[in-house]
Amino acid sequence: MVFFSCNNCGEACKKNQVERHLFQCRNTTFSCIDCQLVYTRETYKDHVKCITENQKYGGKNYVEKENKGEAKQNAWVDQVNRAIEFVTDSQVKELLKSVAGFANIPRKEAKFINFLTNSCRLRDKNLALRAWQAIAAEADKMREEAIRKQEETQKMEKAQKEAAAAAKKETTVATTAAEVTDAPESTFKWKKVIKRKLKENGGEMKIKKLKKAIIEELSAAGAASDDVDSIFDEKLQKCAAVTVDGKKVSLVV
């Protein structure tokens, strides 16, 4: 419960006593006893909750933990405020505006109607019931919105997981394919094949013909490569068992 002090006479008032006190001190303002902020007759209703002693004396880094009951009450106040915003019945709208100024608005229908009768001096039970129905309608809407948002979040998370799994699978497949392609080339016996091809052709061949024969061997071994030309030239230069003379290559006798 929020307590105020009248800045005209100094009398302390509970929040639900401020309206009555305004008949005594008409043009006054009120200071919150806890936070010392000043409120007018129009703004005091918005001051629903004030700082606790722990917040007041706990230092600048203190963070107040919201208990479950308080969380439920705050959610209920949100429903009341939404009802005020969207209700089209002017009587209900004005009634809910006056209700919104109270700290602990009952969350059960029977208690809510009794609260309107006792605290708001409302004698029209039909109006009280319409006010309850307006809040209940917003509660249903908020519940549906929460379910829809949760479903959208779950769909998004599922899509992200599936995309990540697909990307991982694609990377794995590409890596495996690269390993399969690269493995035969890394184990391909270049020097032995070069010497064998030369022996099969009388110890001498044109470089172009030898390269073609080597590429056929590579393809048969499943080791096709985009840079086979440069690899062939490098392997040929390093092969001590052959000599290169212009466009021909011969075995060293």
From Swiss-Prot:
Primary place of residence? nucleus
- GO terms, biological process: negative regulation of transcription by RNA polymerase II; rRNA processing
Q: Which InterPro entries match?
A: LYAR (IPR039999), Znf_C2H2_LYAR (IPR014898), Znf_C2H2_sf (IPR036236)
GO CC, alphabetical: nucleolus
The record's GO molecular-function terms, alphabetically, read: DNA binding; zinc ion binding
Q: Which UniProt keywords apply?
A: Coiled coil, Metal-binding, Nucleus, Repeat, Zinc, Zinc-finger
Reading the lineage from the top rank, the first entry is Eukaryota
Q: In this entry, which stretches build a coiled coil? A: 136-171
Q: Which residues bind Zn(2+) 1?
A: 6, 9, 21, 25
* Compartments in which it is found: Nucleus
Residues of the signal sequence?
none
Zn-finger segments (C2HC LYAR-type): 1-26, 27-51
Q: Which Pfam families match?
A: zf-LYAR (PF08790)
Give me the residues that bind Zn(2+) 2, please.
32, 35, 47, 50
What's the protein name? Uncharacterized protein C16C10.8
Q: Which organism is it from?
A: Caenorhabditis elegans
Identify the taxonomic lineage of the organism of origin.
Eukaryota, Metazoa, Ecdysozoa, Nematoda, Chromadorea
